[in-house]
């Protein structure tokens, strides 16, 4: 039976299972997939922090539903999605390589279609995702926004994990420890 960490995300209370990673570190696992009420709550709270941005970008997969809610709340008809593998429709897109995240443990790449890259060009871009921990995934998104010619306006996360809670360049709704 898993242990749990109880958290409060701006009034939304939930319990996160504590799970071990292969490197021996334990994390409080945050999963928005399939949880419509939590996604709506977190997306609306992040949207309050995103005022002034022209477009939202996220990385698949857990950020997708957040980006949808934030964009809807801001009245934006589109948001950009960085994919973790190159899709058929991305032949004329852009890509960046970045380091390993705490959950994958391996170097990765992010891909952006030409359509989504064009959405970012010259725009104030708000990066939205579920959790920031090591900052490697964020670095990949920042590099992608810069490569597309966007202007990084805000970096918003539901949770800041571990040392990420001390970063001054990001905003979060709650913090969790590395265990």
Model-based region annotation:
Residues 60-66, 134:
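Gly/Ser/Thr-rich loops at beta-strand to alpha-helix junctions
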Residues 78-125:
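Short, glycine/charge-rich flexible loops or terminal/linker lids adjacent to PRPP-binding catalytic cores
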Residues 65-74, 141-142:
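Short Gly/Thr/Asp-enriched flexible loops that form oxyanion-binding sites at enzyme active sites
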Residues 74, 96-101, 171-174:
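Short, hinge-like loop/turn segments at secondary-structure boundaries
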Residues 1-53:
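Active-site-facing substrate-recognition patch
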Residues 53-60:
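Short glycine-rich phosphate-binding loop at a beta-alpha junction
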Residues 2-6, 139-179:
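PRPP-dependent phosphoribosyltransferase catalytic core
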Residues 54, 123, 153:
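Conserved acidic residues
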């Amino acid at each position: 039976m898993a242990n749990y960490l109880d958290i409060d995300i701006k009034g939304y209370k939930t319990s996160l299972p504590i799970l071990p990673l292969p490197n021996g570190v334990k994390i409080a696992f945050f999963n928005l997939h399939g949880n419509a009420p939590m996604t709506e709550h977190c997306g609306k709270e992040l949207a309050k922090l995103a005022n002034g941005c022209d477009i939202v970008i996220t990385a698949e997969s857990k950020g997708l539903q957040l980006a949808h809610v934030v964009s809807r709340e801001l009245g934006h008809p589109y948001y950009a999605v960085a994919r973790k593998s190159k899709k058929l429709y991305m032949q004329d897109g852009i890509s960046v390589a970045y380091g390993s995240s705490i959950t994958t443990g391996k170097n990765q790449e992010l891909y952006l279609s030409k359509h989504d890259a064009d959405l970012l060009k010259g725009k104030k871009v708000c990066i939205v995702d579920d959790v920031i921990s090591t900052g490697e995934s964020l670095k990949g998104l920042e590099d992608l926004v810069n490569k597309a010619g966007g202007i990084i306006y805000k970096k918003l996360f539901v949770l800041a994990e571990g040392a990420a809670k001390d970063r001054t360049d990001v905003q979060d709704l709650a913090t969790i420890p590395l265990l």
